[in-house]
């Protein structure tokens, strides 16, 4: 039986992949069309978004760039918290009573001691930047809404996800773009990066999407789920692998302007709860992800 799905943030990195994923995969979900432009900070624009009532909602939209959150924390909180509240209120006014999946972030955990790795959902969050604060606050709001309104509310905490189409403000996309330019003779074989002597838990965007859809079907109401690979990858090694795939020799140079605050040296999450509840597991290898990202950037660079 086909179920109606409404998704915010369809124009973003994950949203675009979700549209393609639903069009190509055999799933019980039919993506509802968006009848007009809307702004989550303008409640009047939300009232008639749903000619057909959705069975489920995935709330992807938000301000996700950490440096921007430091630059304008008020705006980040408005978009990520007040925008979420406006969406919840509009859905309630429309009579929604289905499944609501809020997409938070693994960044809410903050600084985690290496002895506490891998990161489990039971770990108490200690957000260290305004973006993470806004996501944790919105998590609480959504879970409270589920209790008081009787909706089936779930929270996903994705860790770093990667794939074709990501902005080059993210480290792997930035490296892939620069390497693609080197391969085409458009820049010197000198790669400018931020702090790459750290490890992160990277997951392909296709695996992220399959996790979200599994949660819609099988997740437990009121629960929080890490969405991650369960593996840590050193960023420097991934850049070297990108260069190897592209067959490009390069010099790596750290750019102080690209360094971020509130970094920690190692990140590795646990997806045990997600696997135990839904049967989900990652399917795409890191090398497959990097090949797809590099191929995408080679095409985009040719069009620049």
Swiss-Prot record:
EC number, as in UniProt: 1.1.1.281
Class of enzymatic activity (EC top level): oxidoreductase
Gene3D superfamilies according to UniProt: NAD(P)-binding Rossmann-like Domain, UDP-galactose 4-epimerase, domain 1
Function description: Reductase that catalyzes the conversion of GDP-6-deoxy-D-mannose to GDP-4-dehydro-6-deoxy-D-mannose (GDP-D-rhamnose).
UniProt keyword list: NAD, NADP, Oxidoreductase
InterPro entries hit by this protein: Epimerase_deHydtase (IPR001509), NAD(P)-bd_dom_sf (IPR036291)
Coiled coil (UniProt feature): none
Residues reported to bind NADP(+): 13-14, 39-40, 131
Sites where the protein binds substrate: 105-106, 160, 200, 260-263
UniProt superkingdom: Bacteria
One biological process term in Gene Ontology: GDP-D-rhamnose biosynthetic process
Protein family membership: Belongs to the NAD(P)-dependent epimerase/dehydratase family. GDP-6-deoxy-D-mannose reductase subfamily.
SUPFAM superfamilies associated with the record: NAD(P)-binding Rossmann-fold domains (SSF51735)
Short name of one Pfam family: Epimerase
Catalytic activity: GDP-alpha-D-rhamnose + NAD(+) = GDP-4-dehydro-alpha-D-rhamnose + NADH + H(+); GDP-alpha-D-rhamnose + NADP(+) = GDP-4-dehydro-alpha-D-rhamnose + NADPH + H(+)
Gene (name only): rmd
Keyword NADP listed: yes
Name the record gives this protein: GDP-6-deoxy-D-mannose reductase
A single MF term (Gene Ontology): GDP-4-dehydro-6-deoxy-D-mannose reductase activity
Signal peptide limits: none
